[in-house]
């Protein structure tokens, strides 16, 4: 099941998901350091990383949505929908956390706790995304799915 959102047969969605994942995890680490040290630079770095993760998630959602809409009826549609919903929940939670952290400075623990829930939602979405690719071959060209079998036949 190859994807329509690709560049030279390489799916775009997996190329972009590394940004929100990395930035959101980094933002949580930085915010934890801020809570432990109260050094304001860590809060600032955390907010920039969280904002970058929000932007990255929106950008990754575009080809992800194209992939989802072009799946058609299949056995993986439920997994894909749950993947999409979980990541949308993560995006929503991190966006709310970012807004609260910016405008509700006196309550530093609430955005951090929300971000942990966002991390959980992102982890579930990532797990399901991995299942779509590695267990069901979504976004993998037909040749790639059978490459291991072809190599074994020629050895």
Question: What is each of the regions a protein language model found here?
Answer:
Residues 1-155:
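Polytopic transmembrane helical bundles with strong interfacial aromatic enrichment
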């Amino acid at each position: 099941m190859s994807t329509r959102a690709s560049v030279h047969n390489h799916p775009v969605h997996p190329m972009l998901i590394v940004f929100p994942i990395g930035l959101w995890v980094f933002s949580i680490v930085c915010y934890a350091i801020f809570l432990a040290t109260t050094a304001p630079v860590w809060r600032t770095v955390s907010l920039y990383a969280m904002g970058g993760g929000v932007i990255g998630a929106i950008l990754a959602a575009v080809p992800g949505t194209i992939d989802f809409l072009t799946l058609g009826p299949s056995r993986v549609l439920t997994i894909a929908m749950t993947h999409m919903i979980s990541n949308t929940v993560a995006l929503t939670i991190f966006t709310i956390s970012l807004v609260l952290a910016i405008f509700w400075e006196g309550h530093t623990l609430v955005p951090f706790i929300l971000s942990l829930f966002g991390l959980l939602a992102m982890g579930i979405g990532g797990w399901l995304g991995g299942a779509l690719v590695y267990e069901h071959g979504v976004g993998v060209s037909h040749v790639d799915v059978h490459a291991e079998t072809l190599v074994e036949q020629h050895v």
